[in-house]
Amino acid sequence: FLLRVSPDLEWHVACLKCAECGQPLDETCTCFLRDGKAYCKRDYGRLFGIKCAQCRAAFSSSDLVMRARDHVYHLECFRCAACGRQLLPGDQFCLRERDLLCRADHGPPPDGAAARGPRSPAPPPAHLAEPVPGRPPGPRPQSHKAAEKTTRVRTVLNEKQLHTLRTCYAANPRPDALMKEQLVEMTGLSPRVIRVWFQNKRCKDKKKSILMKQLQQQQHSDKTSLQGLTGTPLVAGSPVRHESAVQGSAVEVQTYQPPWKALSDFALQSDLEPPAAFQQLVSFSESGSLGTSSGSDVTSLSSQLPDTPNSMVPSPAET
């Protein structure tokens, strides 16, 4: 008998075995083909199936896995390569080749000065000092007068005055002298207070824009830098069940009987069971009753033979 594994491949029953373990393969088990070789399901999954990117072990159909781009990990292997902390769903991490790094390990170093280049601008201070309107800024105190504190007069603006100044600033951040005189009449403030307020407002907006620009550059550098190495920032998702254990489709094995086999069996069966007329003729010849039989009996017997060319008649010597 032959085993047909695919439409154009056939094996003898004794020749169809797993190329790795030698297990006989038949129509009762699953067979996989690769490069002209047959494999059982266990060896095919072990050799050519998807493996964990960390431990390089194969997956079973019941394993829960974590995916990062094209890489698949066991739940226990989905850890930071630097600190060994297991990454949970929702954690931010960075993928460098097959290694995973948590945000704390791939983020910028705590020392901002070391991370900046020689031409990088210095970050703005955390707290910005604001000049107080109503009194011109005096000279900076010397080191021996650092302990002394000067009392500054602060001008408190009401809601109406602030609304008027902000509306004018939105229309023109640098008003001319005529506009300032109109603001003095509308708000009741001194020209010096109005001038200082516009200066402070422009300074605040400029520092705010510089700070926002630096934050955007820092976020961009966090995404593309990994302590001097490039990586891909990702967010861990929920574990999923690994269903595709092997890549490839199983091939059905069928028992196949060649056409000449059926013809040979028919010929053997015909030889074992001769026709009834032939058996009767043989029995007559062995018993010797053919010579004593009448011509009518011989004629009737010969008529039962399908391939006898002439009728048998008794010879004159026998009569």
Swiss-Prot record:
GO CC annotations on file: nucleus
UniProt keyword list: Developmental protein, DNA-binding, Homeobox, LIM domain, Metal-binding, Nucleus, Repeat, Zinc
Ranges of residues in domain LIM zinc-binding: 1-43, 52-106
DNA-binding region per UniProt: 150-209
Record field: compositional bias (Polar residues): 218-230, 304-319
Ranges where the record places region Disordered: 106-151, 218-237, 286-319
GO biological process terms held by the UniProt record: axonogenesis; neuron fate specification; positive regulation of transcription by RNA polymerase II; response to retinoic acid
Disulfide feature: none
This protein's record includes keyword Amino-acid biosynthesis: no
One matching Pfam family: Homeodomain
Biased composition (Low complexity): 286-303
Keyword presence, Repeat: yes
Localization annotation: Nucleus
Listed SUPFAM superfamilies: Glucocorticoid receptor-like (DNA-binding domain), Homeodomain-like
A molecular-function term among this protein's GO annotations: DNA-binding transcription factor activity, RNA polymerase II-specific
Its biological purpose: Transcriptional factor that defines subclasses of motoneurons that segregate into columns in the spinal cord and select distinct axon pathways. Acts in conjunction with LIM-1, LIM-3 and ISL-1.
PANTHER family xref list: INSULIN GENE ENHANCER PROTEIN, INSULIN GENE ENHANCER PROTEIN ISL-2
Name of the protein: Insulin gene enhancer protein ISL-2
Organism: Gallus gallus (Chicken)
